[in-house]
Amino acid sequence: MVSYYLHSPQFLALRPRSQKDYEYVLNRALQTPVSVSKAFESIRIAKVSVSDCKIVYQSWLQKGKRMANNTATVLSVVFNMAEELELLASNPMRRVKKAKQEVRRVMWSREQVKLFLDTAYSQYKWRSIGLIVHMAYEFAQRVGDMRLLEWKCIDFDTKRLDLVQSKRRAEVHIPINASLLAMLKEQHDDFGFQEYVAPQVNPRDKNYRPYNEFDVSILVNEVKAEAGLPKELTAMDMRRTAITEMVEAGVATTQIMAVSGHNSPQSMRPYIKHTFKSSQNALARRDSYKNEVS
């Protein structure tokens, strides 16, 4: 059934990036053990039960709520298609209670960012992972866009990034600071012969491919462990951290939106954390205004 879905018009209508992610998620889901001697893929589609789905979902939860829910969502697409084809009476994944994902407020400190990057850049195997996280932080962009970033988006002459975001198709044009520019030039010297800015450092079948989201998570965790950083930190928190830093610096909302690609101030709310520094800056500006008018 999964093979049928992967050749269906519904799947082929997805963007290439989504196709790669869906295929990877489905392949991993099929390998999930249902029992000691049986993998999920060994069960005939008509025989998949709610109990089977609950077992594999609990296994996915060990890798995190986000990953578990994402996998369940993608697999449900296949089950829904099977239901439409009358191969299943109903989608068994619908009856699996999903873990609630709390709104994340986690942020990196500047010291933690530096420690992560120093650790990642210290070993060749983590070089591209370090660059992906570095760009996500400096550009305030999503990790997904950075792992798939192509050299055509980087203009070394004008020192800028020109990107069409994958989620909302927003266009952003961002200057590249000196430290990141130096890393990009070094990366281009070694990997400029192919299209991706931060590909897997070891080619497969002589092809350099981008990391998928799960590999990024695994390798980021490796770097964090080596650096002694808290487990709660994730690469996706870099975007929130960067946006919050701009808020604390007193950058105008419209200017932040020009960097982040948000289409309204309301859509920025999940990324903004109320901090002491923000309050301090706000009250300092109010006091300054009061002194001016008194």
Q: What function would you assign to each model-found segment?
A:
Residues 200-206, 286-294:
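C-terminal secondary-structure termini that scaffold catalytic or DNA-interacting sites
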Residues 3-62, 78:
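Basic/aromatic-enriched alpha-helical hairpins
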Residues 118-129, 139, 174, 189-196, ...:
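Short, basic (Lys/Arg/His-rich) helix/loop patches that form interaction surfaces
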Residues 166-186, 194-222:
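C-terminal catalytic core of Y-nucleophile DNA break-rejoin enzymes
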Residues 107, 165-169, 260-285:
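Catalytic-site neighborhood detector that most strongly recognizes the C-terminal catalytic loop/helix
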Residues 69-71, 84, 88-143, 147, ...:
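Basic, Lys/Arg- and aromatic-enriched nucleic-acid-binding interface segment
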Residues 153-160, 230, 251-272:
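Short, polar N-cap/turn motifs at the start of nucleic acid-interacting alpha helices
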Residues 112, 139-141, 148-189:
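Conserved tyrosine-mediated DNA breakage-rejoining catalytic core shared by Y-recombinases
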